[in-house]
A protein has these predicted regions:
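N-terminal helical capping/dimerization or prosegment-like subdomains
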Residues: 1-86, 246-252, 263-268, 343-347, ...
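Metal-dependent amide/peptide-bond hydrolase catalytic core
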Residues: 2-3, 10, 20, 49-52, ...
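Active-site phosphate/pyrophosphate- and oxyanion-stabilizing loops and adjacent acidic/basic residues
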Residues: 37, 147-151, 294, 312-313
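Generic recognition of long tandem-repeat/solenoid scaffolds
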Residues: 59-63, 98-105, 272-275
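Active-site metal-coordination/substrate-binding segment of hydrolases
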Residues: 71-135, 337
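Short glycine-aspartate micro-motif
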Residues: 71-73, 103, 157-163, 180-182, ...
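Acidic-glycine-rich active-site phosphate/pyrophosphate-binding loop
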Residues: 83-99, 158, 173-184, 324
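Acidic/histidine-rich catalytic neighborhood of metal-dependent amide-processing enzymes
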Residues: 111-180
């Protein structure tokens, strides 16, 4: 008996109802298992590879097509950012309410809608079509699940990649990379009533940050734009009446090339005692004239995505295959209170991905790529 087609709405609501906050490996692993079960019920021929990293789980599902043919890879993450201050939400962020043609809740746009659309395309794929679905964890904290899966992806002859993040179903050709640094200053503790006997690490950090914005060696790319920085987290000191002997800022920089020059700048500053690299992901950019991109049934935006995606990991292992960010959802509500996704966009994405999969010819590895 043939299994029913994947119910987009029911699956999306179930996923939203199950919190999968980055760093919660158990919750993410459970959802990976649910998705695998749902897909295997509808496509029992799918081959499944599960990652062994306990902290950053991942799953790769693919058709049993000729392994020597180039794979179309759909790459999704199942984690979300936290739903901070639930009282500020008009609805419970994990109820998955269906109202007004929208599914409401954390992860609706980022990116459980994309997961569902990609899963529908894989479930409908002919077993002979070389297509794979990569499901990762912990994308929101530096694409750690994708990094754990990178070696497995590197073994595939990937011909093209779709990352179904929220773009309003428009094709995006890339985004900046990310360099997150923990920059630390060191001082000398003393009683707060005699600050002259100590050295204040917080004041050093404040002076450093005040200077950095005007002198950081930012570069500009014609497509990606100019590099940016955001000192996102600052910490220092212990109690008011002690001169702080340490302080730290975590800086988020979005890069258009290798981040070595920026890292070197921070390390060279006189106030800096130590720099720790937390995230280092390269930028992504696919040529607009790529023949496969031209074949996609969606408009191509002339601007990059403002966020980074797992594409920053995949670009390092797919040997020049074109990568697009393309999926359902509204970028403006990603990480926001009252996140939602339009059901019409989810249905449109599922249909478009299914069409792209059905037309994928999977040329032999080593041959010239074709759309």
């Amino acid at each position: 008996m043939t299994a029913p087609a994947l119910d987009l709405v029911a699956l999306l609501r179930e996923l939203v109802r199950r919190p999968t906050v980055s760093g919660d490996a158990g919750a993410q692993r459970d959802v990976l298992g649910t998705l695998t079960e749902v897909l295997r019920e509808r496509a029992p021929h799918l081959q499944v590879t599960e990652g062994r990293d306990r902290d950053h789980p991942w799953t790769l599902l693919r058709t049993p097509a000729d392994p020597g043919r180039r794979q179309l890879l759909l790459a999704c993450h199942v984690d979300t950012v936290p739903a901070t201050d639930p009282a500020a939400w008009q609805r419970d962020p994990f109820d998955g309410d269906l109202d007004g043609g929208r599914v409401w809740g954390r992860g609706g746009s980022d990116m459980k809608a994309g997961v569902v659309a990609a899963a529908a395309a894989l479930a409908a794929a002919d077993p002979g079509t070389p297509v794979a679905l990569l499901l990762t964890s912990d994308e929101e904290i530096g694409s750690q699940g994708a990094a754990a899966a990178a070696a497995a992806v590197a073994e595939l002859p990937v011909g093209a990649v779709v990352v179904p993040e929220a773009t309003g179903n428009q094709v995006v050709l890339g985004h900046k990379g990310a360099l997150w640094l923990a920059v630390r200053t060191a001082g000398r503790a003393a009683h707060g009533s005699t600050p002259e006997r100590g050295h204040n690490a917080v004041l050093d950090l404040a002076a450093l940050l005040a200077r950095a914005g005007g002198v950081l060696p930012f570069r500009t790319d014609p497509f990606l734009g100019t590099e940016t920085w955001n000192p996102g987290v600052v910490a220092g000191g212990t109690v008011p009446n002690v001169v702080p002997d340490r302080a730290e800022v975590v800086v988020d920089m979005r890069t258009v090339a290798d981040g070595g020059d920026l890292l070197a700048w921070w390390r060279a500053q006189p106030e800096v005692a130590d720099v720790e690299v937390r995230v280092d992901l390269p930028p992504v950019g696919t040529p607009a004239d790529d023949p496969w991109v031209a074949s996609l049934p969606a408009p191509v935006l002339p601007t990059p995505a403002t966020y980074f995606t797992d594409a920053s990991v995949l670009v390092q292992v797919v040997r020049g295959a074109p990568i697009v960010v393309w999926g359902p959802g509204t970028p403006a509500v990603m990480h926001a209170v009252d996140e939602y996704v339009e059901l019409a966009e989810v249905e449109q994405a599922a249909a478009a991905f299914t069409d792209v999969v059905s037309r994928w010819n999977g040329p032999p590895a080593g041959s010239r790529r074709e759309p």
